[in-house]
Every structure is written in structure tokens, then in C-alpha cells.
Amino acid sequence: MDYQLPQEFVQLADLTRQFVRRQLWPHEEAVEQQDSVPQELRLRLRAAAVELGLFAFNMPEDAGGPGLPYLAQVLIREQLGQASVALADIVGRPPKALLACRPEQRERLLLPAVRGEKIWAFALPGPGRPTVAGG
């Protein structure tokens, strides 16, 4: 049995490592001191991730993503984990919940998220507030 990583997975990990070192690490100290990521930087990093094909690496091909196997996704996350979460999460993993979009929602919600044009968040209200999450 061959336990070596496929060469294309190694190349993805190397690409991600270079992205982290060149694009994310230089901003870590400033982001930590400011306790936020400036919008201009966020947009620039997202555009770079889209250009390199790293954005939405978790999405299947039929949703506009690369359709990477989980092992390749793990190798990408491993490299992104070398940077601050505040910066690494800009690379983007649109929520898989968007895959449940109805056909009429696909163009408006799912595809722009996969292309990096829309950013999504999930939030719950504070204690004692009504929520529909989980039922």
C-alpha cells in the first residue's frame, strides 16, 4: 500500500504555505495590536485567495468549488493553521449549509459565496432570546 501523498496535494499544501508566509504572516502583528482586520486588507487577501484557487476549497465542483477530497482540504487547513485565525479565515470556507439552497437561491446566495463575492456568518442571539437554530 502506498502511503505517500498525491503530488497534486503536496503542491496545494506548498501553494498554501507560500500564501500564508507571504500574504498572512506580514500582517499578524498589526492585526493582533488593532484587534481587527482592516476592510481593505480583508478584501485584498480574499482576492488573492480567489486568484490562487484557495478560496472556497471546501466546496464541491457542482457548487463552483474545486471538489477537493478531504485529505487535500486537511492539508490546506494545516497550512492555514500556521497563521492567525483572524487572517486565515479570510481565505474562506463558505458554509456547507449553503449547499441546501433551493434552485432559485443558488444564483443569489451560493455561487456568489463560493466566488468570494459574498461573505456569510452564523450567529445566535444571547441567552433567553428566541432562536430557530436547531429546530
Language model region names:
Residues 1-88, 103, 108, 112:
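Amphipathic, small/basic residue-rich leader segments at the start of a protein or domain
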Residues 65-66, 103-135:
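Glycine-rich, Trp-frequent "lid" loop and neighboring beta-strands that shape
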Residues 85-97, 114-123:
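FAD-binding core of FAD-dependent oxidoreductases
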Residues 32-34, 96-97, 127-130:
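Juxtamembrane/interface motifs at transmembrane-helix termini
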